[in-house]
Design a protein with these regions (language model features):
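HIT superfamily nucleotide-processing domains
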Residues: 1-124
Length: 124
């Protein structure tokens, strides 16, 4: 719990842009989260501080500050993202119950690392 609090504090600090991207790119194995999926390009895990009954984060293992920085070189990540979302929606039976896939940007983005929220009002 202490490590999670420290990480959230760092995530909102001025060094976060460099630090978060570097950690996901080089140290994702050490991030203390409840993992659901992991590929060469992404990590999906339960949000440590959920805002919804089901709240999953999907984060690239590459420093990408926001959706505005995604390029053609990130096509592999985008394919992994869609396959991961489809797999989780199926596994957690969210199709019938409803879900949303959200990406925040600009002033709505708290952490300067691209990440997607897979959420549902219904527990998984």
């Amino acid at each position: 719990v202490r490590i999670q609090r420290l990480l959230f504090k760092v995530a909102r600090s001025p060094i976060a842009t460099f630090f978060i991207g570097w950690v996901f790119a080089h140290m994702s194995f050490a991030i203390p989260v409840n993992r659901l999926r992991e590929t060469e390009r992404l990590l999906a895990f339960y949000h440590p501080q959920p805002s919804y009954p089901l709240h999953i984060l999907i984060v690239p293992k590459k420093a990408i500050p926001s959706v505005m920085h995604v390029t053609g070189a990130d096509a592999g990540f985008m394919v992994d993202l869609m396959q991961t979302v489809q797999s989780l929606v199926s596994e957690l039976q969210l199709e019938a119950r409803g879900y949303r896939l959200i990406v925040n940007g600009g002033e709505y983005q708290d952490v300067p690392q691209l990440h997607f929220h897979l959420i549902s009002e219904h527990d998984g």
